[in-house]
From Swiss-Prot:
This is Probable outer membrane protein pmp15. Keywords: Cell outer membrane, Cell wall, Membrane, Secreted, Signal, Transmembrane, Transmembrane beta strand. Gene3D superfamilies: Autotransporter beta-domain. One of its GO terms (cellular component) is extracellular region. Pfam families: Autotransporter, Chlam_PMP, ChlamPMP_M.
Amino acid sequence: MRFFCFGMLLPFTFVLANEGLQLPLETYITLSPEYQAAPQVGFTHNQNQDLAIVGNHNDFILDYKYYRSNGGALTCKNLLISENIGNVFFEKNVCPNSGGAIYAAQNCTISKNQNYAFTTNLVSDNPTATAGSLLGGALFAINCSITNNLGQGTFVDNLALNKGGALYTETNLSIKDNKGPIIIKQNRALNSDSLGGGIYSGNSLNIEGNSGAIQITSNSSGSGGGIFSTQTLTISSNKKLIEISENSAFANNYGSNFNPGGGGLTTTFCTILNNREGVLFNNNQSQSNGGAIHAKSIIIKENGPVYFLNNTATRGGALLNLSAGSGNGSFILSADNGDIIFNNNTASKHALNPPYRNAIHSTPNMNLQIGARPGYRVLFYDPIEHELPSSFPILFNFETGHTGTVLFSGEHVHQNFTDEMNFFSYLRNTSELRQGVLAVEDGAGLACYKFFQRGGTLLLGQGAVITTAGTIPTPSSTPTTVGSTITLNHIAIDLPSILSFQAQAPKIWIYPTKTGSTYTEDSNPTITISGTLTLRNSNNEDPYDSLDLSHSLEKVPLLYIVDVAAQKINSSQLDLSTLNSGEHYGYQGIWSTYWVETTTITNPTSLLGANTKHKLLYANWSPLGYRPHPERRGEFITNALWQSAYTALAGLHSLSSWDEEKGHAASLQGIGLLVHQKDKNGFKGFRSHMTGYSATTEATSSQSPNFSLGFAQFFSKAKEHESQNSTSSHHYFSGMCIENTLFKEWIRLSVSLAYMFTSEHTHTMYQGLLEGNSQGSFHNHTLAGALSCVFLPQPHGESLQIYPFITALAIRGNLAAFQESGDHAREFSLHRPLTDVSLPVGIRASWKNHHRVPLVWLTEISYRSTLYRQDPELHSKLLISQGTWTTQATPVTYNALGIKVKNTMQVFPKVTLSLDYSADISSSTLSHYLNVASRMRF
């Protein structure tokens, strides 16, 4: 329902700026709907009176309102919009000063509402006017709080001339603890020096604890296209994605008090902290500084993934530190719960066409710190410009827990973008690697004035460049390389990238001096290379699962050193012996390394040819087999044959039913089995549980052997120790048993035979250095047999009987070949089936009670020794590397102790119930068997 209020009606028409769209406006000076019966002129445009819009169950709509001063629809001192179940809409309202829809002289609170929307509101009936404040296209307030709303909040197509295309607050704005999403889209502030296309806050803006997604998109202004917050901006503890995209800061008119920029946002202190689903800055534009963010200080920590994609500016494609005001700027980027990614951000300050790729541009004395926690990365597919003087060193992996990776890569640079600026990060001050990994890959380069490796690993991939650069003592001075030094003490080579097609060896280079178009050797810098040289992959893991290492390799280029005639690169302490030391998984082999040194004549027209000393480190590889990572070894798959064997033996137990009475009988049994296989000899054990049912028929007579036939179906689950690997199985069992007595019933002989088909699904979860999961389906076949001999005493009528027995058990299991899917997928096929022949020997005692309810108690104790065993083995192959190995099962002890207790109760003349428990105990295995059976004779 729409609420229309009566009052004085004045026709009015205005032209929406830059749209050419004429909208008829009706001017209302009205009351809130509840006061329509007794209107008070001017109540809704009184800056000294509070106003509340609360508890509406129907839609509340104020549209096409105009007021001659502030607040096109409402003007008040404090405004509360709360607990409205119906939608709240402010649409197409206009005023010539501030607050196109709402003007709150002090505070505005929007809380606990369902959907609320501010659309197509405007300040100024004349878009060319410059007089007046012209602030807040939708809303003006000294302080504003948008909190605890349940539905969607929408601020779309609002327009102001100076500040706050949609929202303007003189001091603080809080967007906090909202359950529904918030959309701030296509709002504009039009003047050339306007601020905050979507939001303007005169002091602080907090976006915290929201459960719904926040979208700030397609807004524009002179500076701070999406957001302008004068002092602080905090985006923290939000549960859904925060998106700041497609915003534009169009001003390029610098002034003494105007330094425009920030296509996405502009502020002094920006904190982006603990946002679970991450933050996205995409396709924001600035005609001046900082395509995504223009801020003096930025802290990005403890978030999910943070993306800076496709942003563009004149300086600082993604980020630029604001140089105005007192104090020094600092950028702290820490990938703690997700990666931080810079890709396809561009800048144009050097008037390149097309613009060159750039992630960060620094102004003087910026403090830049970049790091990543284990398993996470800060990925720079765009270079950094840290050229202006700073007393603060750039710190890579600056905190104790930063053992992750900071990567510079040219992987995504278009093949036509050949200019060096698309690949090189210029670090013209001091840089330090504290710990973790600093990786340079795919043609990217670090040009450093001073670089010190205090710890961690410098990982170099194909085409990577580490080179010298001059420093700039003052912003207006010429770069100088005097004092330039690079110290490296632990280099790793990304071997898979070096082995890729047309790969180039990573290069350590003293960059030549350029005068005009002439290049000459630069003898000022020094480079020291020492410590160990190791081989890794791009994830800083052993690279030996590469398929290339399955065969011999010759003349693999590992490292290229480009020195000057004065020999300013010292690599004499580089230790190459570590290439063949230590253990690793994957392909095994031996590296043979050698240097090739060349002295050339300087070529002043060639950037690379200007230097005259060239050294290339080559290596040859001789393979010697394959060793799988323990998580890939796969004994859990082989152990499936043992799990099926235990289940088949449980099925055999259900076939034998010794009964002195003759006739026919049928039984229905519920069966359970719990097996605990211990770890042994470095192989992981497992824990499995099985439940199922069995149906058997029996025929007994005094003239012929007893015969029983049974069918069973079992369901089992198994889990490997110390991992999340699991198997679900479905077993189909059938068997028969023949019993007869010999030597005047002194000996009872029984023969049991069984076959079981098992369908299995396995799920492997990788942890530690390996991540991901794989799954596969397979089946196996199990044959089981038992030959049992029981020595029966005479006479039968005794209530207590004790007699020995001996049994021969045989098991054989086969597994069909199968292939996994997913991460680290493997292929398995049978190498040797499981074969086990054992001999349980023991004593059985039975006691009969012929009272009111006849009972029979049976106990057994036995010792089982294995006569012959062939442990199962599988042929295993890692598909990604084609590495092969043999997978064994977890060892099972050859001897075990067996205990059994069974109680049979005759509940009716022809019906018995029984409960049977048995356990097998050994140093490797503990199993518990339980059988509940009901048997009827015919």
